């Protein structure tokens, strides 16, 4: 009888314990503003500082998924063409790392809508090019944000000096509002899976990064093949390949006689490598991970068989 009397109390304690554990798990699944900011600073393809992200709102959509809206400070490089039209050329994704905006829009499949190169009205004082209005319009057109809008806030427009540049260039620092979808990866914490701006659709960042790397890989292979052809021309005239263990030395010898364009860095903005002996050579790129001697290295060797 005593054992039977204890059983309901025992079961009750188990049920209470389980409910408490579920409650604790639910608390741990909550996404704080700090966690959201950390995830956004390290979203795929980006390395941002904490000060570059201002989280405006966070909401859970399930125990392991959430959405967050934030303002992100981005740095863009604008270029002016021969017809005096401005375009967004690059976006800075990490310290000393830039991505080609045309390449990103091609991978994402985005198109720009607004015409932003109409002449600005006359103004007094120092003229800033592009004007804040034009910069905001170009960014809004790129990101699917109808200008004017608080979703695009220009912080600074400043000249961007590039030695021997053929086109005028300007740096634009802007705060862009983004919507993000996040997933709880357990021990890895919260991670951004998708991003949306303005009226654009949701974009999977890992898919975009993979698409960018695929295009860059094709570009790297084409560039290495071009250098390899120059080395074959060199051997045809000199009787051997260029003997060197530095890519910069090889390019200095090949350009411009055998190579019309000096190709020094790969699409990930890392120096190509060269190892050359009289009878053979190896050209390589460290690939997407920017590390030598790893599985994603891109290698072209000669002579071709």
Question: Whereabouts are the PLM-identified features?
Answer:
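Extracytoplasmic
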Residues: 50-53, 73, 278
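Bacterial Sec-dependent signal peptides at the C-terminal "C-region" and cleavage site
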Residues: 22-31
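Low-complexity, intrinsically disordered terminal/linker segments enriched in charged
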Residues: 30-47, 59-62, 67-73, 90-186, ...
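Short, basic/low-complexity N-terminal boundary segments at the transition from targeting/disordered tails
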Residues: 37-48, 53-54, 137-144, 239-259
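Low-complexity, acidic interaction segments enriched in glycine
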Residues: 165-167, 175-184, 189-209, 217-305
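N-terminal secretory signal peptides that target proteins for export/translocation
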Residues: 1-10
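Bacterial N-terminal signal peptides
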Residues: 14-23
């Amino acid at each position: 009888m005593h054992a039977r009397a204890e059983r309901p109390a025992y079961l009750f304690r188990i049920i209470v314990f389980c409910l408490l554990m579920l409650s604790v798990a639910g608390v741990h699944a909550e996404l704080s503003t700090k966690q959201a900011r950390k995830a956004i600073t390290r979203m795929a393809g980006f390395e941002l500082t904490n000060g570059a992200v201002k989280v405006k709102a966070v909401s859970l959509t399930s125990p392991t998924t959430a959405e967050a809206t934030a303002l992100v400070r981005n740095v863009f490089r604008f270029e002016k063409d021969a017809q005096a039209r401005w375009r967004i050329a690059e976006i800075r994704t990490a310290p000393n790392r830039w991505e080609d905006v045309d390449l990103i829009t091609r991978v994402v499949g985005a198109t720009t809508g607004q015409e932003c190169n109409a002449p600005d009205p006359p103004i007094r004082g120092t003229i800033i090019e592009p004007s804040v209005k034009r910069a905001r319009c170009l960014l809004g057109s790129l990101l699917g944000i109808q200008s004017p809008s608080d979703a695009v806030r220009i912080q600074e427009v400043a000249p961007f000096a590039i030695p021997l540049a053929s086109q005028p260039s300007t740096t634009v620092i802007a705060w862009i509002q983004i919507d993000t979808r996040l997933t709880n990866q357990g021990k890895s914490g919260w991670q951004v899976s998708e991003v949306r701006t303005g009226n654009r659709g949701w974009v999977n960042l890992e898919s975009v990064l993979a698409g960018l790397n695929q295009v860059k890989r094709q570009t790297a292979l084409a560039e290495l093949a071009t250098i390899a052809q120059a080395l074959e021309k060199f051997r045809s005239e000199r009787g051997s390949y260029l003997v060197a263990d530095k890519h910069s030395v090889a390019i200095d010898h090949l350009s411009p006689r055998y190579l019309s364009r000096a190709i020094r860095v790969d699409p990930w903005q890392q120096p190509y490598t060269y190892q050359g002996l009289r009878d053979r050579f190896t050209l390589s790129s460290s690939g997407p991970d920017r590390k030598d001697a790893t599985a994603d290295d891109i290698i072209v060797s000669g002579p071709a068989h």
